[in-house]
Amino acid sequence: MKKRLISLLMVLTLMVSLVGCAEESTSNEGKSVKQDVTVAWDIEPPMLDPTLTTSTAARDINKYIYEGVVEMDANFEPQPQLAEKIEHNDDNTEWTFYLRKGVKFHDGTEMKAEDVAASLNRWSGINGSAKLIIKNGEKFEVKDDYTVTIKLDTPCLLFLYYLANPSQFAGITKKSIVEAADSSSGYKSIIGTGAMKFVEWKQNEYIKLEKFADYSAPSAKLSGFAGDKTVNFNTLTFYMVNDASTRVAGALADQYDFVNKISYDSMNQFDGVTNCSLTQGQYMIGGLIFEKKEGCGSYSEDPNFRRAVSYALDINEIAKAQVPNSDYVTIDSDYMGPFQTAWDTNAGDAYYNKHDLAKAKEYLAQSKYDGGTVKMVTNTEYPDMYNGTLVVQKQLEAIGIKVEVEVMDWATQLTRIN
């Protein structure tokens, strides 16, 4: 009998995410700015529906297209974006969103409360976190053209944090687009209120965006994802370049202005290149995802099996496979990351990276594991995930778990996870 364990790998890493190499032209503000910007992008997103997909490749492109009623600032605090003002009662069950007037969608129509309510009601039925707080069919209601309300059955102090979460983002689009959306493939039209509008998607080649001349920015300066997102260039084209060495070569040859996900052993190629700059950003490399829904028939339903896996893992060795240069990785129990100061905690230290084969075998013997095959799912588009999975396979086999690794493309893996 085959059981299944869907798997990604987690370490907290400091990742070199972007290289910028650009020739410049002069803008009307007197600053040197290139007007047609090109990016070599590592992964083609499965869709450009901000609410339906969990893909970071989609999220980072969608942030130019869509906005939310609130967005996260640089300190990971939610701030009004399409909302002008937000009010709530003392127990955080009744929320009122007063919308900014005159905000236009990319088709030229004005955003109204019916669009916001439709978008947020769809979000609340899809987003996993939203389902934890909107459990009993509560709905966002239209009070007037510029006011949306919701009454929660359960108090939620963190409601705005859920709304501002960039994963499965509560991006606002037209009511008609929400109503026509497909439950699997998402929105049929890509229209938001963001600083750039969608122009063209040529599969396996590029996604092109264009500056939205009628963009209505909030008064606050840009901080994180919140505030004025006005761009000072005309077009932004994301070219799908899966191979990391090809992205590097393209940057060095001035084929692309920006390149993401530079491999650690390629960074020295930019030493002395005066028109290029490296930007480093912290991000999390996935996490182990167990299929453990009650009744699914997976070994992962058993807490002792999961404990056995935890003690079998040597995170240090996994990290070496994922990030060869130790200068760019931090191993930490903190799920959110120390850079998110509001959420930083060491609560998991007692259980994290406690590699102990004897304890692992002890828990495995107490579990329901009967010698069957555990399946791990991974992909090669993200080398850190693939390389880490192979190390985990060896570590689990070392305590007597039979492991089969299934490799698929990232879009298919996301579908399996969802």
Question: For the regions a protein language model found, what residue spans apply to each?
Answer:
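Surface-exposed binding/hinge segments that line
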Residues: D91, L132-V178, A195-K202
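Gly/Pro-rich hinge or "lid" segments in bacterial periplasmic/extracellular proteins
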Residues: A74-E77, P166-T235, S245-T246, A358
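Ligand-site clamp/hinge motif
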Residues: A217-Q269, K402
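Periplasmic-binding protein-like
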Residues: Y299-Q340, D384-G388
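A structural "hinge/loop" feature
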Residues: W41-R59, L82-A83, T109, L157-F169, ...
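Ligand/substrate-recognition segments at binding pockets and active sites
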Residues: K361, A365-N418
